[in-house]
């Protein structure tokens, strides 16, 4: 879940429990020789202003833009943090999951898209963003800025099974599951 707004907390008596950090990495096909991008270049590519890989030191070939669906948390972080709420070109191909994004980029040598850091594997190549490697360590330290906190939200103070579940999420076992899922556990704050 997302961070609660003050209005929601006041109106519904909600409480937030941050439990993990999620990072977003820009990715290309492993055959693409481009391995770095700046925030401005990302904004220009996704806005349709840069349309050829040659502008980034790559091949003289058109860039194919991939994005996530409206409502995707990954897209929300990407648009807010990487694009600074800038536009995404209307011709962008829309995919509905991190897995679908990896498949699309893995099959398109001219594609660029983004996935959660925990989903980066050999099927895609993650780009450094403003000279920072998109790693779990850099996301946890705050050095890599394309991140967001994930929250558990409850109405009022948690009790019973809800409290037990939240305690479990913060336990070593819960932290291991969070890591295995590709996120970075925050521990109890």
What are these regions (language model features)?
Residues 1-189:
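Exported/periplasmic ABC-transporter solute-binding proteins
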């Amino acid at each position: 879940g997302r961070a609660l707004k003050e209005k929601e907390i006041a109106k519904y008596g909600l409480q937030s429990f941050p439990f993990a950090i999620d990072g977003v990495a820009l990715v290309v096909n492993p055959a693409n020789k481009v391995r770095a991008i700046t925030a401005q270049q990302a904004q220009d590519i996704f806005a349709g202003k840069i349309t050829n890989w040659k502008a980034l030191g790559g091949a003289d070939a058109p860039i194919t833009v991939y994005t996530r669906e409206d409502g995707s948390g990954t897209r929300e972080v990407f648009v807010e943090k990487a694009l600074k709420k800038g536009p995404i070109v209307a011709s962008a191909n829309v995919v509905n999951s991190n897995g679908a994004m990896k498949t699309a980029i893995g099959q398109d040598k001219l594609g660029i898209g983004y996935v959660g850091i925990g989903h980066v594997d050999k099927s895609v190549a993650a780009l450094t963003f403003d000279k920072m490697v998109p790693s779990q360590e850099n996301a946890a330290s705050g050095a890599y800025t394309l991140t967001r906190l994930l929250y558990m939200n409850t109405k009022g103070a948690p009790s019973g099974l809800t409290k037990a579940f939240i305690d479990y999420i913060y336990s070593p076992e819960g932290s291991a599951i969070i890591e295995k899922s590709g996120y970075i556990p925050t521990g109890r704050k």
